[in-house]
From Swiss-Prot:
This is Recombination protein RecR. Keywords: DNA damage, DNA recombination, DNA repair, Metal-binding, Zinc, Zinc-finger. GO terms for molecular function: DNA binding; zinc ion binding. One of its GO terms (biological process) is DNA recombination. InterPro entries: DNA_Rcmb_RecR, Rcmb_RecR, Rcmb_RecR_Znf, TOPRIM_dom, TOPRIM_RecR. Belongs to the RecR family. A zinc finger (C4-type) spans 57-72. The gene is recR. It holds the Pfam family RecR_HhH. It comes from the Bacteria. May play a role in DNA repair. It seems to be involved in an RecBC-independent recombinational process of DNA repair. It may act with RecF and RecO. Coiled coil: none annotated. NCBIfam families: recR (TIGR00615).
């Protein structure tokens, strides 16, 4: 079937989004054109501005339109002395929603993966080393994902911390709240048992 070249181009562009296949892209394109053209225009304008104006924070490497993001420039956060290392900016949003972390962050934008040719410098560890040497950091919290690559990355960074004389800690992994033990995989259960804590009354 012959369709409008612009419509085809729109559907192809929408497929760059994760989880969006041909059918989903077609549905999105038709919905915007049929029912919400003003929404489509707002989306286009927001995308254009974001793609051209959003860069990386000079300190933590998260997304921001400023030289230094709001978290890194916050005096209270600076005084705290804790830095949480995460794999992506999305992880910062997840942690910030808990309201439990008062420090700053460092975003790797990935993890070590020798098989894919991703080494320490590719995920900004040279910059992290500079910060370990020049800043007064009380604790580096390693919040990389609980995958083989995430664990390897955390161990590598922990070695950098040891060399710099900075305390390093790893976030706990274990049974999710509301979960049932029989549904938990063996590796997660092993982490839960190893990371158990005493109940004090």
């Amino acid at each position: 079937m012959q369709t409008s070249p612009l419509l085809t181009q729109l559907m192809e562009a929408l497929r760059c989004l994760p989880g969006v296949g041909p059918k989903s892209a077609q549905r999105m394109a038709f919905t915007l054109l049929q029912r919400d053209r003003s929404g489509g225009m707002r989306l286009a304008q927001a995308l254009t501005r974001a793609m051209s104006e959003i860069g990386h924070c000079a300190d933590c490497r998260t997304f921001t339109e400023q030289d230094v993001c709001n978290i890194c420039s916050n005096p209270r956060r600076q005084e705290n002395g804790q830095i949480c290392v995460v794999e992506s900016p999305a992880d910062i949003y997840a942690i910030e929603q808990t309201g439990q972390f008062p420090g700053r962050y460092f975003v790797l934008m990935g993890h070590l993966s020798p098989l894919d040719g991703i080494g320490p410098d590719d995920i900004g560890l040279d910059r992290l080393e500079q910060r370990l040497a020049s800043e007064k950091i009380s604790e580096l919290i390693l919040a990389t994902n609980p995958t083989v690559e995430g664990e390897a990355t955390a161990n590598y960074i922990a070695e950098l911390c040891a060399e710099a004389g900075v305390e390093a800690s790893r976030i706990a992994h274990g049974v999710p709240v509301g979960g049932e033990l029989e549904m938990v995989d063996g590796t997660t259960l092993s982490h839960s048992l190893a990371g158990r804590h005493k109940i004090i009354f």
